[in-house]
Amino acid sequence: MRQMNKTGIAHIYASQNNTIIHVTDPTGAETIAMVSGGMVVKNDRDQASPYAAMKAADMVSEALKEKEITDLIIKVRAPGGNKSKIPGPGAQAAIRALSRAGLKIVRIEEVTPIPHDGTKKKGGKRGRRV
């Protein structure tokens, strides 16, 4: 009987202010590794940068190699709701760094929450005036 590849789920939350990479087991119950952009850079303004996301992904891939996880399902998330539905600058860099680290990417999903007429957007009655 051949050995099954160990799979993990990488939840990448990429906003304009930070990038968080959180890897769990397939059920989502157990955290395997969690690194944010703020853990790898000194300046707060660099937390969301592609460089910080790349370094965070490298730290995550080291932890995954220790746990012998070879396959990854990636779920990319933006702030969503009534905020931005576009992932921040660190999302693509994190995915690229994870694939370069030798991990097999099974699939990439977009899981940004979409409002079904939820709460009111900020900006007042007439919206943001420029």
Swiss-Prot record:
GO molecular function: rRNA binding; structural constituent of ribosome
Pfam families xref list: Ribosomal_S11
Gene3D superfamilies linked to this entry: Ribosomal protein S11
Alphabetical UniProt keywords: Ribonucleoprotein, Ribosomal protein, RNA-binding, rRNA-binding
Superkingdom as given in the UniProt entry: Archaea
Family affiliation: Belongs to the universal ribosomal protein uS11 family.
Protein known as: Small ribosomal subunit protein uS11
